[in-house]
């Protein structure tokens, strides 16, 4: 009976240790995923700002080019 108790205790102890290790790894993986999500959101926000600025610059450049063409045409008509 004593051997049975010791072996049962050993099995339970090893089970708890492996469960603890698995939970720790799970927490680490969740933390890594959370960090990856935060980095992805930061990159998305950065690209959104960059593309907005590029669009604004392109809009102003297009307006300036159209103005120059209109000036050239009006000077040619005179």
From Swiss-Prot:
The modification Glutamine amide is found at residue 75. One of its GO terms (biological process) is defense response to bacterium. The keyword Secreted applies. Keywords: Amidation, Amphibian defense peptide, Antibiotic, Antimicrobial, Cleavage on pair of basic residues, Fungicide, Secreted, Signal. Residues 1-22 form the signal peptide. Expressed by the skin glands. Possesses a potent antimicrobial activity against bacteria, fungi and protozoa. Probably acts by disturbing membrane functions with its amphipathic structure. Belongs to the frog skin active peptide (FSAP) family. Dermaseptin subfamily. This is Dermaseptin-B1.
